[in-house]
A protein has these predicted regions:
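Non-catalytic helical/linker scaffolds that mediate oligomerization, partner binding
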Residues: 1-320
Length: 320
């Protein structure tokens, strides 16, 4: 799961550069000097010199020493820190399990309410996804299983995680904190390509139209970001704070929809020319691709996919 700080007496504090700050696994309510942790084993996972990033990297702490259940740090980049914000170690390597007892309860709840997707946060390997799949089956949950790629280890084990999942989420927030902002754009393209090669779905997420939390229109950079995700071949783009806490939830959906529709009109993604040289394992996939190429060259306006299970339509959607 995502590792978080606890709550503060006043709901939030301001950390100043070069000030000492303690992460205390036994602290109940925090203040400007210390705060609790929801992951009690974090002191075992860090050592002096480690860099800890809080609130998606907005604040930065350097570990000075570990004393029992306390992590003594120095604030390197300060700012406001509020309740339940996330913690990452730069470079990854935390031992927190992907699935907790609460996750198992949540999977059972998901089965009862009939959700379409179950996403596993912070998986490290295929083993985490197989465990989630087993729990879903035991609970009678038929949802598609999505791996949120957020850890350095998940990037290294991407192929096996894809094979164990129905799709992946390119979760750029925590991923950027672990691998560095500059590495994320290339990784996004790599992950989408790897998923497409396996006919697995991809969801691209995090700060796609972040400015629309407070602004009625997106920035040009955000428009380009969303469009490029579509051009990369992502199956879905996702909003978070923009709709959960933003002032313009309807407008941001409308804006994102317009950008996606315009990007999908691009001839560059109409057909993937690498498919010409691809060897197909499934007859239905090869027939679907042949139909798409035929339709493209005949300039038809639509394809009617006759299907009983819906799989034909899914196969034919893959070039886009």
């Amino acid at each position: 799961p995502k590792i978080r700080v606890g709550k503060f007496e006043e709901g939030r504090v301001t950390l100043t550069r070069d000030a000492p700050f303690i992460l205390d696994a036994r602290c109940e309510l925090g203040n400007a000097q210390r705060v609790g942790l929801d992951y009690k084993d974090l002191p075992k996972d860090v050592k002096p010199g480690d860099v800890l990033l809080l609130d998606d990297g907005r604040l930065k702490l350097t570990v000075q020493r570990v004393v029992g259940h306390e992590i003594h740090t120095t604030v390197k980049v300060g700012g406001e820190l509020s309740n339940n914000k996330g913690i990452n170690r730069q470079g990854g390597g935390l031992t927190a399990p992907a699935l907790t007892a609460k996750d198992m309860d949540d999977i059972r709840t998901a089965a009862l309410i009939g959700v379409d997707f179950v996403a596993v946060s912070f998986p490290k390997s295929a083993a985490d996804m197989y465990m989630a799949r087993q729990l879903m089956r035991a609970a009678g949950c038929a949802a598609l299983l999505i791996a949120k790629i957020e850890r350095t280890e998940a990037v290294a084990n991407l192929d096996e995680i894809l094979d164990a999942s129905d799709g992946i989420m390119v979760a750029r927030g925590d991923l950027a904190v672990e691998v560095g902002d500059a590495a994320v754009p290339a990784l996004q393209k790599k992950m989408i390509r790897a998923a497409r090669d396996r006919n697995k779905l991809t969801i691209t997420a995090t700060q796609m139209m972040e400015s629309m939390i407070t602004s009625p229109v997106p920035t040009r950079a955000e428009v380009s970001d969303v469009a490029n995700a579509v051009l990369d071949g992502t199956d879905a783009v996702m909003l978070s704070a923009e709709t959960a806490a933003g002032k313009y939830p309807v407008e941001v959906i409308e804006s994102m929809s317009r950008v996606c529709e315009e990007a999908e009109k691009s001839a560059e993604i109409g057909l993937d020319r690498e498919l010409l040289n691809r060897v197909f394992d499934r007859i239905d996939e090869s027939i679907a691709i042949a139909a798409i190429w035929t339709a493209y060259h005949l300039k038809v306006k639509a394809i009617a996919a006759l299907t009983q299970t819906g799989s034909t339509a899914l196969w034919m959607s893959r070039p886009n």
